[in-house]
Amino acid sequence: DWETNLAGLKNTRGKCYVNSISLKEGEEEFIRKAIEIRRLGGDVIVMAFDQEGQATTLPRRKEICQRAYNLLISRGGYSPDHIIFDPNILTVGTGISEHDTYAIDFIETVRWIKENLPGAKTSGGVSNLSFAFRGNNKVREAMHSVFLYHAIQGGLDMAIVNPSMLQLYSQIEPELLRCVEDVILNSDPQATER
């Protein structure tokens, strides 16, 4: 809720991050909110979402992040180091083929942001990744760890994650690690079945 975000910004000492704004209500509303956040000393977390919906492919994620970055700098008065992008960590392993690339597309978007939107930071909500495996905490924990391992290598700066839902990457059982790597990196279409 926007009013709650504003109240938090007005009444919190120290640095605040507003999670989140997006282009889904159009450019003018996006800029209005961004300027208000900046005026109150906050940084923005920008979701890869616009009037056409949530970005689910690599090209759409790049397009929306580039557009938001340009608007925040040119019209919002932001310096790049006050912009954080969340390019949407979406659920993989659902059995729906369109979802197979969601994790690797997120990682590639993070890498692209680091190369093309200088100074911007990246973030994401990790638990979304493994919703298809609710009730199987061992698999979910391995998925989160493997995903973070690769996303951090790609340039991920921060993540929203439940630390009790993580395993050490180096301690994941080899067969589980192989299966999870195949799901996250979309390197084997049969990985979810294994």
PLM-predicted stretches and their roles:
Residues 111, 117, 121-124, 128-194:
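Active-site loops and adjacent core secondary-structure elements that bind or stabilize anionic groups
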Residues 34-38, 56-89, 99:
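Conserved alpha/beta-domain cores
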